Amino acid sequence: MSDNPADLPVLVAGGGIGGLAAALALVRRGFSVKVLEQAPEIGEIGAGIQLGPNAFHAFDALGIGEKARGRAVYTDEMVMHDAIDGSLVGRIPTGEAFRQRFGNPYAVIHRVDVHLSLLEGAQETGKVEFLTSTRALRIEQDEGSVTVYDQHGNAHKGIALIGADGVKSVVREQFVGDAARVTGHVVYRAVVDKKDFPESLQWNAASIWVGPNCHLVHYPLRGGEQYNVVVTFHSRQPEQWGVTEGSKEEVQSYFQGICPQARQLIDLPKTWKRWATADREPIGQWSFGRVTLLGDAAHPTTQYMAQGACMAMEDGVTLGEALRVNNNDFPKAFELYQRSRVARTARIVLSSREMGRIYHAQGVERLVRNDLWKGRTPERFYDAMEWLYGWNVGNCLAKD
């Protein structure tokens, strides 16, 4: 390539969903990629995640639409119940009318299956090298290249660096230096086999029960053979961001006042994973010469909009498009990528905080929430979602 005479790879710090999305987008632009992953193997942890139409637009743009579609479960609706009295607050059909409106379905899927689809796609290109047990420590750049020094003292040289190394991003720490914002909200996640899941709750829906300072989510996974269970509460103790083993006693202690139908979800999992959540204040710059940030490294968000993985994949697609229109000029492309993503991802971060407040409303605020959403037509819900689900590769770049 004209701007890469030494045929250097593009370096990607992080082999999660965002890093792999970036790798696929870069390969589609003709680059080879070296992924530096600090874990001993390329993999993913977690449970289920929700995928809006924007995620499927991203899958298609990255060339893995068929793989991802084959692993997803397609819901009939999104349903919200009040966790105190069990009443229906609202429902949003996600069938044919939804698909026609947004051009793609709404689905639920195991996070591991999203990662696997991306990983298979990257491996099949033959253009992505993976280095595991490799943690970026320091980055240097000059006019034509970037060098990443790892914990073993090795130097990795590339034409550019994508920092997709998560909430605790080393790349962000060097170039931005801000602190993560620990929310005090704790998420417990588990997967339950269908045979152990109550028949009365085996709905083909993304279901949420909203309560004071808490909520519960469940939906089917893997052809309906498993169910994802996610519960969130406001912790009584100081928290630090991270993932640990969950405690049945702890999670049960936070859901004493909810209705029996929702309460039974707490007793189902044999084991839980516990996430103390964090986000960051939105920033206006995350591109620095030949270095840029992507996914949680750029705009970590809480889970209330169900858009963390979706935003990372959108980032990858947008990055590829920015390179295309800038003839693979990385500094210029990174500027356009940043300009195209800052406002949208900031809106996700801030909207997610507000959605958490609405979900966890109590007292009179709870009554107002329920009245606002009861009886709302699907069309009104769809109109409110247009800014989110209307994203696609054709409109992803900022206009001059």
Swiss-Prot record:
UniProt keyword NAD, yes or no: yes
The keyword DNA-binding appears for this protein: no
One protein family per Pfam: FAD_binding_3
InterPro entries, A to Z: FAD-bd, FAD-dep_Monooxygenase_BioMet, FAD/NAD-bd_sf
Molecular functions (GO terms): 3-hydroxybenzoate 6-monooxygenase activity; FAD binding
EC assignment: 1.14.13.24
Cofactor(s) this protein requires: FAD
GO biological process: catabolic process
Function: Catalyzes the NAD- or NADP-dependent conversion of 3-hydroxybenzoate to gentisate. The affinity of the enzyme toward NAD is twice as high as for NADP.
Assembly and oligomerization: Monomer.
Family: Belongs to the 3-hydroxybenzoate 6-hydroxylase family.
Protein name, as recorded: 3-hydroxybenzoate 6-hydroxylase
Organism whose genome encodes this protein: Polaromonas naphthalenivorans (strain CJ2)
Gene name as annotated: nagX
